[in-house]
């Protein structure tokens, strides 16, 4: 089994799945974007070992966002996509290390992904990174923040809708 497959097997949890589904659903409603989950990105053009990553030629964000109209169903499916998304979202699960996700963010930024979100379900928080690990904003339910704001992509989402079961 390759390193990516081993890593992906360690990720599942109820909180991870809950938040991934909620975020993908909320982003799906934004008509400017196409929302894709668990998409394999072809990254063989850079050496991932420089970021301390074991993966060789693909990375798989939990959620990624592309401009609307970029993709549609195909007769022959694609296993990897070489065009990078605008946004990559990683949701930390109980068996993941924060440093591993931050290393992926460094690789994503080197691949010209505009923003990366680090979602921590147990803390009900989201960090929005813009182009470097040093440039980020934190949003958390515990601080009474009401929205996640990604200024680069002009996205605003309700934190309550991401982390809480709400009646609409």
Briefly describe each language-model feature range:
Residues 1-168:
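Gly/Pro/Ser/Thr-rich low-complexity, intrinsically disordered segments predominantly at protein N-termini
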């Amino acid at each position: 089994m390759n390193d990516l497959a081993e890593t992906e097997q360690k990720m599942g949890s109820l909180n991870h799945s809950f938040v991934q589904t909620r975020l993908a659903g909320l982003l799906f409603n934004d008509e400017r974007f196409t929302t894709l989950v668990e998409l394999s990105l072809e990254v063989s053009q850079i050496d991932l070992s420089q970021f301390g990553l074991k993966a060789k030629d693909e990375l798989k964000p939990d959620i990624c966002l592309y401009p609307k109209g970029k993709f549609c169903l195909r007769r022959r499916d694609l296993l990897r996509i070489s065009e990078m998304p605008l946004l990559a979202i990683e949701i930390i699960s109980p068996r993941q290390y924060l440093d591993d996700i931050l290393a992926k963010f460094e690789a994503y930024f080197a691949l010209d992904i505009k923003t990366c979100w680090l979602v921590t379900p147990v803390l009900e928080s989201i960090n929005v990174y813009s182009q470097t690990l040093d440039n980020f904003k934190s949003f958390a339910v515990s601080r009474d923040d009401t929205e996640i704001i990604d200024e680069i992509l002009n996205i605003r989402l309700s934190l309550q809708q991401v982390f809480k079961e709400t009646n609409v």
